[in-house]
Amino acid sequence: MKTISTNSPLPLMVGFGGINPAGRASFHHAYRRLVIDKLDQEKQDGTFASLAKLMRLDGNSQDSTVRQYIKDHTLIRKIEIFDPDAVNWHSSATLKNTDAKSITFKIPTKQLPETIPSNWSLTKINDKETQIICEESLSVLLPDERVSKVTSAGQVPSGFDPAALYASRSHPRGLQLTVYGASDAIQSTGFKVEELRNLVRPDEISVYSGSAMGQLDNDAYGGLLQNPLIGRRPTSKHCALGLPEMPGDFVNAYILGSVGETAGIIGACATFLYNVKRAIDDIRSGNKRVVIVGNSEAPVVPHVIEGYRVMGALAEDEELKALDDSDICDNRRACRPFSSNAGFTCAEASIWLVLMDDQLALESGARILGSVPDVFVHADGYKKSIPGPGIGNYLTVAKAMASAKNLLGEQVLRQGSFMQAHGTGTPQNRVTESHILN
């Protein structure tokens, strides 16, 4: 295994921030929401006050009713971004005349298709309407609504609207979260944007970010792919704003004003780590001295939820009811990483790090939060199912532990360290990750 040279720069984390279902990430606000019942009174008060501001609540954050509302409208819960009880759908149907004669109807002339079906006969009624006689059956799509079989997701706190915080101009939700998340991370360093940028030469700062899913809502790829099928036109923004590397482009253009290197590396749930690896490799080699790195995802849209559901990856409501032997789906407990579970839960978030080399961090007086000495990501080799677990997880953990032992010694590794579980909530992950962590 390659070891880290004692002469190479050490990547240090000098800022982090973003937004996720627990709230604002900087200064551990989101983490405190996760463990809020175990905090002392002062920290609880501060956490509730922060969330109340984020959620634009008018009530006093000290009030028990307001606090219960905050608890109920953060973390994993029933989907609020769209109505899971009325998901738009199209049902295909074949229309036939009841008396076996041709089908006759009229429509506005401007709504006629560009290619007239061969079995249609057209008669102009007036300047605005046309009568159509269809000699055979007519295939149509009927607007419909369905109840989603998955109604749980991790969503940013209710009331938080990233689009209201800047001139969003119909930006996809993932990019709206990017602007907030990256801004939060950069401001957490204590440096103004200009100060951070001026610490180094323009080619010594870079931004690495991506989105595994890309932007799939109606303001990006969702609109690009769906609009022609529902009688609308794609817009000039749909294609460009859907690109997976767009979060990094937004940071460069809207926040940092950087002309330095940029890249977007994509890798499913390891996308964030792929970009962190690129960042630390550049810092250790001396090519970069400041790197802003992050990931932004907004997959809580009906077609993405349905796509993961038909894979068998998500916890469906009926499966959760069966686990609890209940007639009611407990949306709050949809994700159960190391328990009896049925699948993972989609969530939206935008999380960012600001990394510096150790010399620059000391010279600039930056607040040092920790180091990121290495990142390991391994493929699984031959396997029958791409989504299934494989040997790569074992190699990744083994190399990470060897790196920690090399840096800190075996005693610290065994007695002074901890492992943060992946914990997706899928039955396969429950088995393989439990085996690795044992």
Which residue ranges define each predicted feature?
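Active-site-proximal alpha-helical scaffold in enzymes
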Residues: 177-191, 244, 248, 262-297, ...
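Conserved catalytic cysteine-centered active-site region
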Residues: 4, 129-176, 214-278, 311, ...
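Conserved small-residue
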Residues: 182, 207, 272, 279, ...
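Short acidic, glycine/serine/threonine-rich loops at helix termini
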Residues: 218-222, 275-277, 301-307, 366, ...
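ACP-dependent fatty acid/polyketide chain-elongation machinery
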Residues: 1-167, 359-371
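Hydrophobic alpha-helical hairpins/lids featuring a short glycine-rich hinge
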Residues: 175-235
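Condensing-enzyme catalytic core mediating Claisen C-C bond formation in acyl metabolism
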Residues: 7-17, 21, 319-412, 417-418
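Short glycine/threonine-rich loop-to-helix capping motif typified by GTGT followed
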Residues: 381-393, 423-438
